[in-house]
Amino acid sequence: MLFLQLPLLLVLLPGGDSEEGFQEPISFQIIWISSFYNRSWEEEVCSAWLGELQTHRREGKSDIVIYRQPWSKGNFSREDLMESEHILRMFFVRFVQAFFNHASQWKLEYPFDVQIAGGCDLYHGETSVGFVRIAYQGSDFASFQNNSWLPSPKGGTRAQLVCKLFNLYQGTLEIIHKLLSDTCPRFVLGLLDAGKADLQRQVRPEAWLSSGPNPSPGHLMLVCHVSGFYPKPIWVMWMRDEQEQPGTQQGDILPNADGTWYLRVTLDVAAGEASGLSCRVKHSSLGGQDIILYWEQHSSVGWILLAVIVPLVLLTGLAFWHRKHWKHCDPSSALHRLE
């Protein structure tokens, strides 16, 4: 019965009303990073994410969890939240203690970093897949699979020793299994339900064209800017008629301060080949009505603005010169000076 509401919630999410929207799972994960400086000094930071949206954060070793969204508690009761937070806190405390106690045996050299990512992926096919992955110094180290810890090939003998120790604690293995298979999917469903108003928000993008620094003599850098859109998935391409231009370069999708996104897409072309090119934008907020901006129109607007601005500047300068010249030649001014 747990996943009976999942298809409906998926439809409510951005992109969920299309076949493409169902291909990607909904991922929730807790990311814990610990930096071990010496035998007694360790710092840590912990955060939780629904996709790329941060929902929770805990700074240092404080027991205070910061809820980053109004709906970050999902539909869990206060008791459920306290119990889950207590279990996770105890797990991380024992995890840190194990690395301190066995640093010499595992040949760990201070300083070093350990990262844990754990959570679950929810799929449209009414399934949930839990995961826990450990990284040491940024490299794959171990993972939790089939109710036990498995070393990564990159972890070598050190990872084998760690997994051998962790697998001795059957009670802890059972708790992890329950968190991944039951607690996590229930909590995610609560988040999706409580936050559906925000998660299904649609904000239309704004797009404009500009020219960047010329990459080489005789070439132009065409730039298509798209900003203010939500959700994040978007398709932007330089086109000639209906043909995608293979030289299109897409930058990173960057966050705006208001929670929307910005993207910059460029195309390097010979100056004589810019005619007929356009930038096309597809986004779920557009309802199938793509934004199409033509480079010729951008160039025409630029020339029109130039044709208007230059005469205005010249007229303003001429008026200023006449005013200054008239002031110096004004007979009344000369009479005042004689008096």
From Swiss-Prot:
GO terms for molecular function: endogenous lipid antigen binding; exogenous lipid antigen binding; lipopeptide binding. InterPro entries: Ig-like_dom (IPR007110), Ig-like_dom_sf (IPR036179), Ig-like_fold (IPR013783), Ig_C1-set (IPR003597), MHC_class-I_related (IPR050208), MHC_I-like_Ag-recog (IPR011161), MHC_I-like_Ag-recog_sf (IPR037055), MHC_I/II-like_Ag-recog (IPR011162). Residues 1-18 form the signal peptide. It is found in: Cell membrane; Membrane raft; Endosome membrane. The gene is CD1A. CDD domains: IgC1_CD1 (cd21029). Heterodimer with B2M (beta-2-microglobulin). Interacts with CD74. Residues 185-295 form the Ig-like domain. During protein synthesis and maturation, CD1 family members bind endogenous lipids that are replaced by lipid or glycolipid antigens when the proteins are internalized and pass through endosomes, before trafficking back to the cell surface. A D-galactosylceramide binds at residues 91-95. Glycans are attached at residues 38, 75, 146. The chain crosses the membrane at residues 301-321. The keyword Transit peptide does not apply. This is T-cell surface glycoprotein CD1a. GO terms for biological process: adaptive immune response; antigen processing and presentation, endogenous lipid antigen via MHC class Ib; antigen processing and presentation, exogenous lipid antigen via MHC class Ib; immune response; positive regulation of T cell mediated cytotoxicity. Residues 19-300 are extracellular.
